[in-house]
């Protein structure tokens, strides 16, 4: 929706003050066991029933920091501004996704050789949408765009190692490598949280594994400060 990190935090704070979402200044993506016990009741309050057992991939006491992940409180929202309604619906949608069944896919990667060259072909078959069905498969469509080299099929072929196949047709196309995409505020926030991820040296990357730039409460402000000092600037949805 194009919200800046600073605006997102401000809206989240407003939702918290209205008591319809939990504490916003958290870096955790997990909830504790005691909060998990309240999830079925929270789902009923927001009008959603999921089949049991609920998905537990977001439940981990060890990964909960001072505050757990942002979730709805179950209070009925009223008199929300447009931006507040957008962010609230995002929180609710992600909450439902988190406890929905896993998405199941079958993937295949095949390497062919003509004796000189080696070619790679990748394909995927969706078995069940699972949590992706919450937004009617929008995530599945996003996944397709992320891996343009992967062919989406309704069924995968049965192939055996060493099998000889006949060449039916061949085309030569030219491609160019692409640079890494520009940062968005979302990817920049992630990079700040995981500051050592791009470090190539193993020892340095491991040393920085638990380090980050700023905290969930200060990262948005750090970005705004850099913009005010003309070190970086916004260009549509990108940061340059």
How should these model regions be labeled?
Residues 1-240:
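Core catalytic DNA strand-manipulation module of type IA topoisomerases
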